[in-house]
């Protein structure tokens, strides 16, 4: 479906992103596509990168972090098979873009960010857009959020060396976790399902994320 000739500015950029970056690469979940066609990615991007807000690559955000490529965001959301009644945990809030998408798809979202400055920025963005079903927490995302578990879906937006046991334990039976696992330089993106208390994993793609720093992630650089 081609973008409407009546669209301009960021609305046109969003429509082109949906058509050329997502639909043409096989994203089919209409709820995911509708959320990404509606939520203003430019609100979560540093001002100088506004012209590239819908470009087909990651963008820098403060403190050496990144906002992921739109296709990877869509791939993760689609793989998670999020239902409207689901409770979701996101690890790695960044400036809040993926949390906003999750808030449009799920009933309740908890998102953890290690950097207090980014967590505060995400809260501002999400409150500005009127979200009331998203809680932003500052902390070690690799440990999850045990006092709110279990979660139907866990999305991890930073790379881990191995599957963190804490996150798997906090996943509901039948739940899905989408997570990049591997070296700091290159990872495999997996969808993990919890069936009869066991981990069943399927590789989706190769990918590259910033490392998740934490007790069950990577150690801080010395």
UniProtKB/Swiss-Prot annotation:
Catalytic residue list: 68
Keyword terms, alphabetized: Cytoplasm, Methyltransferase, S-adenosyl-L-methionine, Transferase
InterPro entries: PCMT, SAM-dependent_MTases_sf
Enzyme Commission number: 2.1.1.77
Principal place of residence: cytoplasm
GO molecular function, one term: protein-L-isoaspartate (D-aspartate) O-methyltransferase activity
Compartments it resides in: Cytoplasm
Enzyme class: transferase
Pfam families: PCMT
RNA-binding is among the record's keywords: no
GO biological process terms on file: methylation; protein modification process; protein repair
PROSITE patterns, A to Z: PCMT (PS01279)
GO cellular component: cytoplasm
Reactions listed under catalytic activity: [protein]-L-isoaspartate + S-adenosyl-L-methionine = [protein]-L-isoaspartate alpha-methyl ester + S-adenosyl-L-homocysteine
Similarity section: Belongs to the methyltransferase superfamily. L-isoaspartyl/D-aspartyl protein methyltransferase family.
Physiological role: Catalyzes the methyl esterification of L-isoaspartyl residues in peptides and proteins that result from spontaneous decomposition of normal L-aspartyl and L-asparaginyl residues. It plays a role in the repair and/or degradation of damaged proteins.
PANTHER family according to UniProt: PROTEIN-L-ISOASPARTATE O-METHYLTRANSFERASE (PTHR11579), PROTEIN-L-ISOASPARTATE(D-ASPARTATE) O-METHYLTRANSFERASE (PTHR11579:SF0)
Protein name: Protein-L-isoaspartate O-methyltransferase
Organism of provenance: Koribacter versatilis (strain Ellin345)
Gene giving rise to this polypeptide: pcm
């Amino acid at each position: 479906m081609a973008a409407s000739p009546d669209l301009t500015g960021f609305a046109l950029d969003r429509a082109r992103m949906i058509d050329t970056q997502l639909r043409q690469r096989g994203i089919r979940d209409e709820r995911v596509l509708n959320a990404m066609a509606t939520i203003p990615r430019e609100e979560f991007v540093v001002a100088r990168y506004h012209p590239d807000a819908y470009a087909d690559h990651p963008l820098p955000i403060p403190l050496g972090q990144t906002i992921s490529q739109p296709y990877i965001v869509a791939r993760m959301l689609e793989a998670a098979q999020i239902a409207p009644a689901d409770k979701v945990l996101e690890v790695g809030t960044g400036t809040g873009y993926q949390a906003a998408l999750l808030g449009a798809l799920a009933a309740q979202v908890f998102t953890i960010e290690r950097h207090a400055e980014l967590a505060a920025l995400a809260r501002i963005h999400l409150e500005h857009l009127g979200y009331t079903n998203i809680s932003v927490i500052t902390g070690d995302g690799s440990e999850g959020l045990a006092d709110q578990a279990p979660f139907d879906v866990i999305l991890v937006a930073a790379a881990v060396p191995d599957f963190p046991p804490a996150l798997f334990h906090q996943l509901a039976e039948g739940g899905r976790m989408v997570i990049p696992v591997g070296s700091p330089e290159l990872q495999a993106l997996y969808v993990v399902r919890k069936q009869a208390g066991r981990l069943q994993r399927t590789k989706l793609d190769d990918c590259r994320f910033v490392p998740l720093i934490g007790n069950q992630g990577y150690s801080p650089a010395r």
